[in-house]
Each structure stands twice: as structure tokens, then as C-alpha cells.
Amino acid sequence: MSEFDAQRVAERIDIVLDILVADDYHSAIHNLEILKAELLRQVAESTPDIPKAPWEI
């Protein structure tokens, strides 16, 4: 995802819910992990470099 789009995130969450209804927990978890990584990467790209606390290294 190139920019945060609440509608797109909602659609992807809906897909994960459909996968859960189908009892495919492994795929649902995998899809959530991918979505989380994409969102975290996007936030990291859009925020200035802030020094990390020692426990975040």
C-alpha cells in the first residue's frame, strides 16, 4: 500500500473475516501479519527518524 487508505484496510480486514468464517485460521493469521507489516512499513516511511530507546534497538 502506497498510502494509508481506510477503505482499503477495511476491505482487507473483511477478507480476513471471510477467511476466518471458512475456518482457515492459518491463512487468516498470515494475511493479518502481511497487513500489519505493510502498515508498519508505511508508518516508518512517513515518520522522521526518531532515536530509538535502548530497549527498542
Curated annotation (Swiss-Prot):
Pfam families: YciZ (PF23675). InterPro entries: UPF0509. Belongs to the UPF0509 family. NCBIfam families: PRK13658.1 (NF010179). HAMAP family: UPF0509. This is UPF0509 protein YciZ. It comes from Escherichia coli O157:H7.
